């Protein structure tokens, strides 16, 4: 199958050579940011969550940013096959009418419509996501610090200019402007190390789920930031892909398991601001993937 390529780190390759690629060995599944590129994985998502993983019973951590968080939240619904079909249909067919006298929708208008889309999709079903018997969901957002702590017409572009400049020198310096803020299924430990970047973890709940998912998908300047999420520190929360575009994380699977990473391209880019920094497009800690 020319459309599908499999890459494996040293430990994962040794494991697969010995046991084959088995659903019971999967411990973590990441879902990258990338907008509509994530839809490429639709048929694979339906196979993995609708047919393949159902042959096993172990706990699996799902780590997603932006559209990856949306995909993996959908995987936690009771009928993932049907849920993914609806997710793809709704994403492709969404239309936003521009009011008379406007050339385009403002970020706040787009955010309001997106919030309603999430409510229409997950309304009455958040409990299915949070109480899934096997899947532990981790939604990555980017929380602004200092000048980016609140959104503003002047402070946001100035803040992101500073973030871009310092990130180009050293990725860890981005933590002066933004921090990784992960919202997880209550009681679930993070399945990756956090020494690489400033990180917080908070619990997902019925009260904050939609706002967290909206924040994880809120691309700066296109959508408005989500402010003051319940159960987390005050501040502006943006797209999780800013800090973790392709979830280039220090995964730490347990029990000799592996990380299965369905991805839409060969390159793994650490952060959104690293897209133009090609020397960072490489695998640093992918031993278990």
Spans of model-derived segments:
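Patatin-like phospholipase
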Residues: 1-61, 74-288
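Gly/Ala-rich beta-loop-alpha elbow adjacent to hydrolase catalytic centers
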Residues: 64, 68
